[in-house]
């Protein structure tokens, strides 16, 4: 079950907004009917996107995972 403030991982690419599978976000709102709003930020704290996603598009973080940094395309932000 996904709850507000959970850290989640994007399960598939969202090319229209420059997000890739594996990007990490924070749940900022859970919709009663299903789905949630997830905020994706740079490591510097800049919000890239707040996206409405279904739970199928997300997965919880796993205890044996490590974050990976990547450069974002400035034209998509």
Walk through the language-model features, giving the residues of each:
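Basic/aromatic-rich interaction segments and small domains that mediate binding to polyanionic partners
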Residues: 2-66
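Long, low-complexity intrinsically disordered regions
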Residues: 63-77
């Amino acid at each position: 079950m996904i709850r507000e403030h959970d850290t989640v991982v994007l399960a598939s690419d969202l090319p229209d907004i420059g997000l890739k599978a594996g990007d990490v976000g924070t749940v900022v709102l859970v919709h009663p009917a299903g789905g949630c709003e997830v905020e994706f930020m740079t490591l510097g704290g800049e919000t890239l996107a707040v996206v409405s996603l279904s739970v199928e598009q997300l997965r919880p973080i796993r205890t044996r995972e490590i974050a990976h940094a990547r450069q974002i395309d400035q034209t998509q932000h």
